[in-house]
């Protein structure tokens, strides 16, 4: 799988930009705030229907325009895909794949698979559990439509349960009983799928991490949840909801469930979030991203596109070398302010260079 072309109209700082991409390595070079990341953002949006930078779709529209248009042409082994997206300032959007209207975001996912690595991804390791849950949810939604459906349903019912906890009456226990049964069903599936994904990360990620660190470090991923027996997760979750109901009524919120879960990343049995150096934390994220690439490849039979947003300059030479030596079978789109540091590791015959300046792109 690879992206053949991207066409943007009124997207961020682009008026009307058509770009053909190499199936190998594409490098966009330019100063900051020229539009390099906007290219990656448009591709990422075409993949999952969301931006990695903003929750407001209207932010993607050029400031003096009423709508933006994105077209991404994707070459697949079985069937090529043309993804068209119109986003309007009133909050509406229209998406088609091969001219067929998409009604749900789950129908968009899987047509264009990408893995993005940006400096902000250090938050997966360093910051709150929400960042780690988000990572798991996005990666699982790419490869599992049932997971996406159950996650949406879980969050919807969770919101309704929390509203009921804030506005309870003498029928509150009957109402919460219904919510708890539904949450247990969807929540158990989410927990089990997250745990399975982390098992895959452990198998694949350990080998990747050893390559990056020359066998000096061992990485491990461990799911942190209240559930002890994954085979009976639904029953156990229902029991925990009932056990914590009094506390939930006092706090007006749901205190346990997959929306509270986390996962631990340890290197040589030490918690990387608390005790890891910045270099170790970057390496852990690198391992997560490259393991995610392999998991997608194993499931769908094709590598996703790899988007590297200004991250190579933050890696030392050993990690730069690992990245650039690992992408020969993967379409990779790189943004950077200069290629001097990575030039010696690039395969010139497999690389296409572009210069980006104030929303204009020049192929070199």
Curated annotation (Swiss-Prot):
A GO BP term here is: DNA synthesis involved in DNA repair
One Gene Ontology cellular component term attached to this UniProt record is: cytoplasm
> Where is ATP bound in this sequence?
30-37
Pfam families linked: SMC_N
Tell me which InterPro entries the record gives: DNA-binding_RecF (IPR001238), DNA-binding_RecF_CS (IPR018078), P-loop_NTPase (IPR027417), RecF/RecN/SMC_N (IPR003395), RecF_2 (IPR042174)
Keyword Metal-binding on entry:
no
Q: Which UniProt keywords apply?
A: ATP-binding, Cytoplasm, DNA damage, DNA repair, DNA replication, DNA-binding, Nucleotide-binding, SOS response
Task: Give the NCBIfam families listed for this entry.
Answer: recf
Function, as annotated: The RecF protein is involved in DNA metabolism; it is required for DNA replication and normal SOS inducibility. RecF binds preferentially to single-stranded, linear DNA. It also seems to bind ATP.
Protein name, per record: DNA replication and repair protein RecF
Q: Which species is this record about?
A: Clostridium botulinum (strain Loch Maree / Type A3)
Q: Coding gene?
A: recF
């Amino acid at each position: 799988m690879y992206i053949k072309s991207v066409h943007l109209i009124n997207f961020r700082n682009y008026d009307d930009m058509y770009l053909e991409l190499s199936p190998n390595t594409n490098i966009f070079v330019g100063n900051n705030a020229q539009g390099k990341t906007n290219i990656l953002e448009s591709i990422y949006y075409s993949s999952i229907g969301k931006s990695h930078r903003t929750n407001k779709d209207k932010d993607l529209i050029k400031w003096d325009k009423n709508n933006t248009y994105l077209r991404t042409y994707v070459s697949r082994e079985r069937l090529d895909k043309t993804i068209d997206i119109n986003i309007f300032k009133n909050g509406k959007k229209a998406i088609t794949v091969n001219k067929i209207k998409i009604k749900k975001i789950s129908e968009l996912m899987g047509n264009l698979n990408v893995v993005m690595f940006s400096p902000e991804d250090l938050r997966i390791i360093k910051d709150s559990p929400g960042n780690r849950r988000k990572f798991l949810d996005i990666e699982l939604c790419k490869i599992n439509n049932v997971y996406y459906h159950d996650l949406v349903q879980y969050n919807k019912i969770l919101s309704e349960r929390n509203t009921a906890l804030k506005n309870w009456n003498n029928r509150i226990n009957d109402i919460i009983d219904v919510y708890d049964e539904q949450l247990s069903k969807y929540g158990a599936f989410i927990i089990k799928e997250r745990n399975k994904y982390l098992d895959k990360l452990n198998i694949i990620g350990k080998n990747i991490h050893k390559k990056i660190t020359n066998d000096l470090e061992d990485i491990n991923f461990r799911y942190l949840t209240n559930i002890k027996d994954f085979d009976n997760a639904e029953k156990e979750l229902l029991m925990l909801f009932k056990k914590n109901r009094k506390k939930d009524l006092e706090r007006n919120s749901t205190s346990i469930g997959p929306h509270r879960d986390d996962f631990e990343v340890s290197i040589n049995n030490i918690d990387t979030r608390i005790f890891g150096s910045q270099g170790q934390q970057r390496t852990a994220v690198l391992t997560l991203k490259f393991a995610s690439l392999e998991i997608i490849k194993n499931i769908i039979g094709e590598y996703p596109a790899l988007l590297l947003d200004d991250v190579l300059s933050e890696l030392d030479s050993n990690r730069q070398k690992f990245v650039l030596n690992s992408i020969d079978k993967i379409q990779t789109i790189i943004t950077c302010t200069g290629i001097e540091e990575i030039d010696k590791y690039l395969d010139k015959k497999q690389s296409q260079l572009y210069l980006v300046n104030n929303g204009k792109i020049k192929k070199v």
